Amino acid sequence: MQASTEAEPIGLIGLGLVGKSIARRLLQAGHKVLGFDLSKEACRAAEGFGVGIGVDAREVGARSGVMLLSLFDSASRRSLLFGEQNLLGALRPGTTLIDTSTGRPSDLTEDHERLAPGGIRLIDAALSGSSKVIADGQAIALVGDRSADAGTYGHMLSAFSKAQYFLGAPGRGLEAKLVVNLVFGLNRLALAEALGLARQANLDLGLMLEILRSGETYSRVMEVKGPMMLRAAYEPPVARLGQHFKDVELIRHWAQDLGARVPVTDTHAHLLQELIDAGFGDLDNAAIFKAYDLRKGRP
């Protein structure tokens, strides 16, 4: 990929697991990155591999024509833009904000409409893939925009995603992401339940995973999450269980708004809540396997 020639750095707010992966890919592609995070530790870590660090979010906004947001949810974005940090007050007309976070689609649409009269474009570019997948450049970007309007930022998305799908309107990328996350989560849950049953029957779990991977039962989550489940190796997390619970709750709320039934996802949410209540929310989401430990009284 050719190096960037833009005079301004790309702004990046949020330097957690996903934000750091995005930053590394942008730097590798030759872009300049100016970032900020409320966590000083996260800022130091990103500065260590070449990210410029702003004094605050407003400095990043003032110096960037295109900004990426990698935040926890819609509330975090609204606090950043309209709350005490008041990023909006530092943005110039013509600035494009690309939100890679997973939040409520309706919130994104509302914020898009709120910002548009001031000449600020807010676009959702939800990423399908863990921080490791993003770091490898293998994520999928689900964009709430038209491809014809992506001229100012499409090359940036290409730095950390192997494919970009344009869904046409603000919020639609997030809707597609929630559908994708539903399948991801239930694939993990199905694998955990199958291995839990096999364990209870004293079957060889390594052999069972090989069998599941060899036929039509295969899913890609088996490649990484399966071995993690067998080893009970959930740290350091690639994607946190608590983060996925947040996504599952978004799916359930969206489904409720649509009048759609998601009974298996409802069950998944209850199992995740049990694990979070037991103190496992910061483990990798492969720790859904521990739900079957809890129900058998295992440690």
Residues of each region from the PLM?
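Interdomain hinge/lid region at the active-site interface
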Residues: 218-280, 285
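Rossmann-fold NAD(P) dinucleotide-binding segment
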Residues: 57-69, 73-122
